[in-house]
Amino acid sequence: MKTEIINRFISYAQVDTQSDENSETCPSTPGQLVLAQMLVGELKAIGMQEVTMDSNGYVMATLPSNTDKEIPTIGFLAHMDTATDFTGADVKPQVIENYNGQDIVLNEALNIVLSPQEFPELAGYKGHTIITTDGTTLLGADDKAGIAEIMTAMDYLIRHPELKHGKVRVAFTPDEEIGRGPDKFDVSAFDAVYAYTMDGGPLGGIEYESFHAASATITCKGTNVHPGSAKGKMVNAAKIAMELHGKLPANETTEETEGYEGFYHLSSIQGDVEQTQLRYLIRDHDRNRFQERKSELARIVEELQKTYGEKRIELEIKDEYFNMREKIEPVMEVVDIATQALENLGIVPNIQPIRGGTDGSQLSYMGLPTPNIFTGGENYHGRFEYVSVDNMMHAVNTIIEIVKLYEQRA
């Protein structure tokens, strides 16, 4: 099974599926359709039933029940796209057997080294088989590790009919990294009572709390005049943008917060004297504090509009997703079973809030409670991304154990 999961993961990682937030299609990039078609073929080859891919690239399949018991249908999901933060083209995964705990030279020519001195958690993987990048791309363990784990678990269950289980649905979705994963997901067609995204990080992670999330775009408009005769005439849009940013709490940024602490994240700033645009991510686990953050940003904009004129500054805020805890707590069985599965396997559950979101954040509000489970990856979205194959195997066993527990509890 170890060789199978390595081969699966590498074959997926080599397909460029980076999503594109500027695209209006679904999926946002053609590479995701290439991977989707691969997955359809593989699902059919291992014996899954009702394998479908719709016009938007959503892949679904069924593992039929093999018992007469009435068992709730559960689902497992992973996303096909990779992050926009770093290139996902021409990924060259490197497999390191029995990692020795020392520096890993990812790329000798470019002097790119993955070091436990810079990433202390790496030392904890001594003795593991790990997969890294070659230092020039991201790896795509987020979330192709999840795809490989779901596929391997389904393959195992099909090969072992003596393991009794209810109906299991799987889905592979596009465009999670740009926040559109569930936009065209057909919850009624998926037809599961509960689901799990395999989209987490290190071993043991179970997550059922996400941020409340919004994005803000602020456009500052100036008047450009020759610097030599600008007095009393020039209005510098870039300077307005700097003033605006300076009014936000300096200790409430991504670099200064952790755990349940929310933040304002200036994700991009572009412009000049004539026009400058700021883009922010607004995040908080608490709904009231989330609303306060949006209101505070609006208040700052209004304050500056009084100084520079209402037409000089425009603010657009869009809600993206909400904390799935509000939808999962009423049905905590879905979390309890995942926790029990880990304990049965001798894995210590690590239940933490997600400082981000998953497809499950939105799916939970669409009527499908969907907590998140670890995949074994680290350092997502960059050249130092890696995944432990040993912990990928633990994730496979976790899926199998969850399926078994639903049958046993029926």
From Swiss-Prot:
Residues at which Zn(2+) 2 binds: 142, 177, 381
A GO BP annotation: peptide catabolic process
GO CC terms: cytosol
EC assignment: 3.4.11.4
Primary localization: cytoplasm
Cofactor note: Binds 2 Zn(2+) ions per subunit.
Cofactors, names only: Zn(2+)
Superkingdom: Bacteria
Compartment(s) where it occurs, according to its Swiss-Prot or TrEMBL record: Cytoplasm
Protein name: Peptidase T
Gene that this sequence comes from: pepT
